[in-house]
Amino acid sequence: VAVEHNAQVYRRQLQELDTSMAADFDSIAPQRRKLVTNHHVLGYLAQRFGFTVIGAIVPSGTTLAAPSPSDLESLVAAIETARVPAIFVDSSQPEKLARVLSEQADIDVQIVPLYSESLSPPGTPGSTYLDMMRSNTDSIVNGLR
């Protein structure tokens, strides 16, 4: 009975989170709903909330792969063409390549950390799934507005 009750409570919290995220993301103009990440981690979020994934610094599904110089040049061009205001990087990964792309782009591009590979320590933003998603939502909204 307790497990069933806790499952219902958590399901309700997830539904409230989804509603809140949708409302927050709706505050971003459609032409600014463009994502560039350090690797492909936001595809489901993009599909669910109406974002376009412009590209990823590491073009494969693993962080062990290294992008080629032509991959990076193509991504810089895509960032400039789409006028992407932010590159979202995992808070637990180095942001060196994102910084290089930001500096090479002929537009202002900020680097915004997200929680995607792991949760943060207890008591900090991103320490639970719900907190992680709230924190990421705030970061995405602030990065794209």
Regions found by a protein language model. Give the residues of each.
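Extracytoplasmic metal-acquisition and chelation regions
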Residues: V1-R145
